[in-house]
Curated annotation (Swiss-Prot):
It comes from Homo sapiens (Human). Pfam families: Defensin_beta_2 (PF13841). PANTHER family: BETA-DEFENSIN 121, BETA-DEFENSIN 123-RELATED. Has antibacterial activity. This is Beta-defensin 121. Abundant expression in the male reproductive tract only. The gene is DEFB121. Keywords: Antibiotic, Antimicrobial, Defensin, Disulfide bond, Secreted, Signal. It is found in: Secreted. One of its GO terms (cellular component) is extracellular region.
Length: 76
């Protein structure tokens, strides 16, 4: 009976593991080091990085040449 109680206690303690902090709209995980397949762009509240799968990171917008748009505006 004591063995059963000990087993139950250990099982309950293992089930109460601290949940992983999520970030980036719940698509990322706060870790000290990211996996090889992950990238990070922001930091979590602690000194951890927000590790995200690259498919969830938005693509950087392509910048337009501002000089050409200014020249065409001044010619009008």
């Amino acid at each position: 009976m004591k063995l059963l109680l000990l087993l139950l206690t250990v099982t309950l303690l293992l089930a109460q593991v601290t949940p992983v902090m999520k970030c980036w709209g719940k698509s990322g995980r706060c870790r000290t080091t990211c996996k090889e397949s992950e990238v990070y762009y922001i930091l979590c509240k602690t000194e951890a990085k927000c590790c995200v799968d690259p498919k969830y990171v938005p693509v950087k917008p392509k910048l337009t040449d501002t000089n050409t748009s200014l020249e065409s505006t001044s010619a009008v």
